[in-house]
């Protein structure tokens, strides 16, 4: 078969295979066009799940008569003009493919009128060459797009459509997702002439909460934590649910980049990591998050559906999102959910905020000549917004290189090490201490202190008990080892090393102290520096800036920990013991993770500190139970 240029209709139908997956895809593209046109009132009429009719009516700026024929042409758009615009996209659409692709697989009619025109005009395309026909029509200022008989000329695609109920459910979800990010726009959704959804404009915060409650449910709002987190021109806002409102399926996860619905692995990993210590692996967090950043720092031209994005600084975005959510979860103050005016005051009081230094917000480059799509997050923040004196929690992952998508399964090397750790000693090397097994617990504890811990790997690990302790065996003796106490011992041993590996922070943490706290800091500053912390001190402003932390503590909430250290009773316990007592211990769901902790601690043991490990072993006396059998 010779090489030839495809007809416009066939080329558009091929493109439609990516853009138009189902009726919900059509609704998404057309509603986004309405929003780009500046509409604040959009009506969506659906018949038979969208297979028979999809009608989108808006009150936007409209399309001039002379541009109507281009509106249905492929690669024709008013939203970008050159490569610079493509690298700073602020509009929802920009590819110029949606209308051409939709019109190639349906009977599409577009009616529009601008404010300058005295009459409206209607355009539609038909035939193999997609020739357009324009005629006068009656229509107010704005645009109406009717898509009838979707996939009428591609039977193979049409037969894959699901039931009307299923297809409409997908359309409903698209409108819900868009309504969550466009609070100033009114949406009306009808199906077969019946109003299904109606979202009024939401200007005030209590009105926005009502819309969130209508979409996500009252229970979500009652358990929601407000986030308003900023660093330079990064801005994270929205709501995250407390861990007790976890979901069994990932059905309440809404994330937006510059007002655009996205699915991104970096963002998902940061959110999961922030919830890791609160949720089991089979539970999902609930959230509505808006991430606003300079459009030059994100590439949305990844896929025709524009659901995927790429960040130029993935690590920065990951750690920034983790910080904001972690701080909200660690300082849980739920919204006081009311529908009256007091909801505004309660909402503002319970907003989680980072203290705002005078960051200079860099303006975005205008897209297509004029920045008509610039969202409101680049406006100067209001002066009456409250500010907290607290500072962000330390990022959970600030080391170079991601381990985001590494499998949880142990590697072959780890499996070999686990097997060696679990092996008991040869019979000739085992000490006969069976005589001590019949003595009481106190006598046994005295004997094991000199015999067992000569090498802790002589102990055989039998089981993980309730994710809290390890059951160990040596010959006929059994012991319980608390994993929480083992973690704290590991931290102490690691911080007592001669050379402590430091981890620089991507985003330094600022502490604003009282005079009493600053005096305590001056007393403990040498201790902090000795174990790997690096601060910049500003005595005049009673401020500390944390730049480096011990690598072993990089996953900890050091903001909370260090503030607690500055308010503690100095005579209560030694500095290092008190510091480790403030650290949060992780939970162990797998035996392999607990064995890793035991192995890491063993490597830090020396002849002088083995006694500390010995004291953690609690003998288990099975004799009373055996006597009852």
From Swiss-Prot:
Q: Does the keyword DNA repair apply?
A: yes
Q: Which GO terms describe its biological process?
A: mismatch repair
- Please, which domain of life does this record's source organism belong to? Bacteria
Which GO terms of the cellular component aspect does the record hold? mismatch repair complex
Mention one GO molecular function.
ATP-dependent DNA damage sensor activity
Short name of any one Pfam family annotated for the protein: HATPase_c_3
- InterPro entries according to UniProt: DNA_mismatch_repair_CS, DNA_mismatch_repair_MutL, DNA_mismatch_S5_2-like, HATPase_C_sf, MutL/Mlh/PMS, MutL/Mlh/Pms-like, MutL_C, MutL_C_dimsub
Arranged from A to Z, the UniProt key words for this protein are:
DNA damage, DNA repair
| Record Gene3D superfamilies | 3.30.230.10, Histidine kinase-like ATPase, C-terminal domain, MutL, C-terminal domain, dimerisation subdomain, MutL, C-terminal domain, regulatory subdomain
| Family statement drawn from the similarity comment of this UniProt entry | Belongs to the DNA mismatch repair MutL/HexB family.
Purpose of the protein: This protein is involved in the repair of mismatches in DNA. It is required for dam-dependent methyl-directed DNA mismatch repair. May act as a 'molecular matchmaker', a protein that promotes the formation of a stable complex between two or more DNA-binding proteins in an ATP-dependent manner without itself being part of a final effector complex.
Q: What is this protein called?
A: DNA mismatch repair protein MutL
Q: Which organism is it from?
A: Haemophilus influenzae (strain 86-028NP)
Source species taxonomy: Bacteria, Pseudomonadati, Pseudomonadota, Gammaproteobacteria, Pasteurellales
Gene name in the database record:
mutL
């Amino acid at each position: 078969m010779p090489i030839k240029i495809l007809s416009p209709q066939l080329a558009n139908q091929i493109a439609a295979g990516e853009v138009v997956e189902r009726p919900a895809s059509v609704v998404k593209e057309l509603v986004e066009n309405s929003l780009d046109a500046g509409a604040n009132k959009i009506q969506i009429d659906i018949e038979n799940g969208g297979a028979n009719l999809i009608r989108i009516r808006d009150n936007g700026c409209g399309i001039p008569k002379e541009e109507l024929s281009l509106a249905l042409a492929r690669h024709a758009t008013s939203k970008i003009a050159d490569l610079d615009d493509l690298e700073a996209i602020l509009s929802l659409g920009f590819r110029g493919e949606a209308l051409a692709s939709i019109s190639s697989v349906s009977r599409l009619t577009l009616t529009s009128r601008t404010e300058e025109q005295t009459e409206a005009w209607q355009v539609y395309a038909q035939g193999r060459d997609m020739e357009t026909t324009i005629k006068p029509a009656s229509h107010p200022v704005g645009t109406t797009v009717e898509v009838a008989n979707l996939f009428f000329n591609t039977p193979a695609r049409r037969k894959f459509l699901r039931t009307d109920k299923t297809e409409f459910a997908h359309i409903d979800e698209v409108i819900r997702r868009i309504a969550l990010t466009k609070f100033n726009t009114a949406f009306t959704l009808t199906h077969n002439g019946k109003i299904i959804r109606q979202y009024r404009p939401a200007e005030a915060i209590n009105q926005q909460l009502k819309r969130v409650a209508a979409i996500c449910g009252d229970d979500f709002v009652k358990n929601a934590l407000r986030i308003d987190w900023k660093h330079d021109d990064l801005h994270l806002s929205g709501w995250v649910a407390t861990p007790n409102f976890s979901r069994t399926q990932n059905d309440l996860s809404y994330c937006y980049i510059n007002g655009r619905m996205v699915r991104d692995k970096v963002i998902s990993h940061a959110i999961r990591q922030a919830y890791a210590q609160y949720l089991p692996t089979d539970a999902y967090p609930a959230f509505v998050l808006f991430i606003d950043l300079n459009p030059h720092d994100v590439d949305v031209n990844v896929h025709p559906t524009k659901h995927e994005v790429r960040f130029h600084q993935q690590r920065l975005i990951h750690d920034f999102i983790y910080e904001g959510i972690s701080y909200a979860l660690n300082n849980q103050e739920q919204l006081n959910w009311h529908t009256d005016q007091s909801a505004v005051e309660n909402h503002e009081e319970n907003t989680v905020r980072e203290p705002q230094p005078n960051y200079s917000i860099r303006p975005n480059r205008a897209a297509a000549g004029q920045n008509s799509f610039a969202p409101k997050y680049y406006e100067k923040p209001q002066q009456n917004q409250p500010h907290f004196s607290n500072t962000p929690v330390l990022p959970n992952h600030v080391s170079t290189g991601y381990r985001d998508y590494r499998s949880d399964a142990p590697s072959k090397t780890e499996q070999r090490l686990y097997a060696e750790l679990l092996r008991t000693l040869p019979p000739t090397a085992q000490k006969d201490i069976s005589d001590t097994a019949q003595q009481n617990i106190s006598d046994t504890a005295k004997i094991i202190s000199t015999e067992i811990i000569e090498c802790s790997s002589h102990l055989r690990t039998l089981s993980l008990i309730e994710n809290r302790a390890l059951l160990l065996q040596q010959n006929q003796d059994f012991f319980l080892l608390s994993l929480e106490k083992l973690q704290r011992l590991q931290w102490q041993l690691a911080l007592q090393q001669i050379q402590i590996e430091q981890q620089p922070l991507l985003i330094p943490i600022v502490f604003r102290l009282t005079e009493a706290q600053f005096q305590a800091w001056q007393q403990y500053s040498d201790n902090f520096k000795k174990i790997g912390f690096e601060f910049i001190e500003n005595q005049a402003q009673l401020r500390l800036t944390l730049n480096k932390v011990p690598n072993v503590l990089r996953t900890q909430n050091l903001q909370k920990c260090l503030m607690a250290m500055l308010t503690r009773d100095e005579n209560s316990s030694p500095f290092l013991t008190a510091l480790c007592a403030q650290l949060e211990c992780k939970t162990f769901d797998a035996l392999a993770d607990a064995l890793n902790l035991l192995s890491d601690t063993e490597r830090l043991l020396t002849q002088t500190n083995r006694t500390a490990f010995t004291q953690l072993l609690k003998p288990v006396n099975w004799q009373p139970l055996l006597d009852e059998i």
